[in-house]
Amino acid sequence: MTPFGEAVRKLRARKGVSQKEMAAALNVTPAYLSALEHGKRGTPTFDLLQRIAGYFNIIWDEAEELFLLARFSDPRIVVDTSGLAPEYTAFVNRLAARIRNLDAVTIGELSMVLENAGKRG
């Protein structure tokens, strides 16, 4: 499950609706909504994100967070390292090869490193 999928599932639970009910209201298939929640589809379109925010009648801050989660929830991300130094390509490939074996603590630590690196540059 992706961060976006988890957020949508929580919103559905809070509203007390099934995937089938939500899918009908959004004019998508229940299978598509299920795949979106489970990270088996790419990121939703901006139009669908707006419909989801409207369906749950969420405030702007919560909608903005949902949009951000969607942006970081593509389960099949491609990292383009063309034009970068060889060590960047090697790093991305090592991460891809080992990501399934990393525990939550290590993921948290790596996330903090990335967050702090963004503040420096």
PLM regions: where:
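A short, Lys/Arg-rich alpha-helix, primarily the initiator
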Residues: 1-14, 98, 109
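DNA major-groove recognition helix of helix-turn-helix/homeodomain DNA-binding modules
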Residues: 47-65
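Conserved hydrophobic/aromatic packing and binding residues within compact polymer-binding modules
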Residues: 8, 12, 22-23, 33-36
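Recognition helix of helix-turn-helix/homeodomain-like DNA-binding domains
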Residues: 27-43, 51
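Short, charged recognition helix plus adjacent turn
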Residues: 64-97
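Mid-protein regulatory/catalytic core that forms ligand/cofactor-binding pockets
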Residues: 100-121
